[in-house]
């Protein structure tokens, strides 16, 4: 009787795209986001970002989305002020320099030819239609997440470390799973629990509290 249990969480801080996200401001197109998990908001500005997720279209089909990971893909960013315009911001505490509502991602600046109003937003919609056969209403049934773009890399001259998004807590998730699969002659049944929602309090049907 008994069980040997290993546990880790597999969710990481990120930006989630809202359900009605596309808007235009000063001839620039943005996607409205809200942050998920415990993030240092000032670290997310002027950082190359990628969009991952799925779009559930009205006809029931599912479209996988991954923009920003291939070297030929465009990337996205959260904008920031130039240093000589940011004097007031630089005097704020770190948790106030960038507010959560300022973490919207810049997605375009080129207007659609012939469009009179919100021409940049319309250009973005035309690209989404061309590449993903996506309408603006499809954002309502999409799950799209924004994360730092780029693959994991070895770090240090001795390559003794790994630099990558999401090491908290996937480094523990990977080692826990491998340990369970490779252990021999165990006294107890082995179990590995990999859960999400830890970043927001372990709530929900797939969090540890369930």
What residue ranges belong to the model's regions?
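N-terminal hydrophobic/helix-forming segments and targeting peptides
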Residues: 1-210
């Amino acid at each position: 009787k008994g069980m040997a249990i290993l546990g880790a969480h597999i969710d990481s801080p990120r930006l989630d795209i809202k359900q009605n996200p596309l808007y235009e401001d000063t001839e620039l197109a943005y996607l409205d986001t809200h942050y998920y998990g415990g993030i240092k908001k000032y670290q997310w500005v002027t950082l190359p970002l990628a969009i991952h997720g799925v779009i559930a279209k009205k006809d029931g089909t599912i479209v996988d989305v991954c923009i920003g990971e291939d070297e030929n893909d465009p990337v996205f960013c959260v904008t920031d002020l130039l240093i000589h315009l940011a004097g007031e911001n630089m005097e704020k505490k770190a948790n106030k320099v960038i507010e959560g509502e300022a973490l919207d991602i810049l997605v375009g600046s080129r207007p659609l030819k012939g469009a009179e109003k919100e021409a940049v937003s319309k250009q973005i919609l035309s690209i989404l239609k061309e590449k993903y056969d996506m309408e603006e209403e499809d954002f309502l049934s999409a799950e799209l997440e924004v994360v730092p773009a780029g693959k994991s890399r070895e770090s240090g001259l001795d390559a003794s470390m790994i630099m990558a998004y999401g090491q908290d807590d996937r480094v523990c998730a990977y080692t826990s799973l491998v340990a369970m699969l490779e252990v021999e002659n165990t006294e107890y049944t082995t179990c590995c629990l990999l859960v999400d929602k830890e970043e927001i309090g372990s709530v929900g049907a797939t969090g540890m509290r369930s």
